[in-house]
Amino acid sequence: MLGLTEDTFLLVASDVHSSDECFEKLEHIAGSTNCLAFLYAGDLDIENYFITRSVQLRNYVFLPVQGNCDNRWAWTDVNLDLPLYRTCEFKGLRIFITHGHLYCDPSSVGLENKDFDLVITGHSHRYNISSEIVDGKRITHMNPGSPARPRGCRASYGMVVFGKDSVSLEIRALEGDGLLAQETIAVDNASERHD
């Protein structure tokens, strides 16, 4: 089954650009009982009726940010806030989400990079997982790529999988369920994480 796992996970995507077919596949994954939330890093282009209706009727937690192609006012029709960036925490993993066209990390909006474990961006339409050390702390960057308009790579989306003893970042192919990239990260106080 496309992208499903027995562990709890976060679905990560960006740059769908009004593709009904791609969004429907992502929604199938987000609707899994193991999916804690659908983190969306911009450029959904919600003027599409199917996508608008799907977001209104969703049965999952949807946390989007505004991309350079999103009309912020169109999102008011579906009662969703569409900030330029958002922060959240799941099971001890501190996350910063932005599209990447204006901001690329927490420090660009006056926050401390070291306060986050994972930075999620979109915009480039190319998947990537990389890490850097900031003030002695490892910060991982994840770009899920684009399931609709990939540039020089396969159509993709991301998953943050919470295993018993680890957090795995995965980039998966939209078609064929292939694993394209993976990295395991440590979370401070991981043993103290709770649902």
Task: State what each model feature region is.
Residues 1-3, 84-92, 129-135:
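Short acidic-hydrophobic surface loop/beta-edge motif
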Residues 1-57, 71, 77-78, 154-156, ...:
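N-terminal active-site segment of His-dependent metallophosphoesterases
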Residues 9-11, 96, 119:
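Hydrophobic positions in the central parallel beta-sheet of the AAA+
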Residues 14-18, 42-46, 67-70, 100-102, ...:
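Active-site metal-binding loops of divalent metal-dependent hydrolases
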Residues 50-52, 74-78, 83, 107-109, ...:
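Short, well-ordered secondary-structure micro-motifs
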Residues 59-115:
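Helix-adjacent hinge/juxtasegments
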Residues 63, 94, 101-170:
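Conserved beta-sheet core of the metallophosphoesterase superfamily
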Residues 163-195:
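Charged phosphate-binding loop/patch that engages nucleotide di/tri-phosphates or the phosphate backbone
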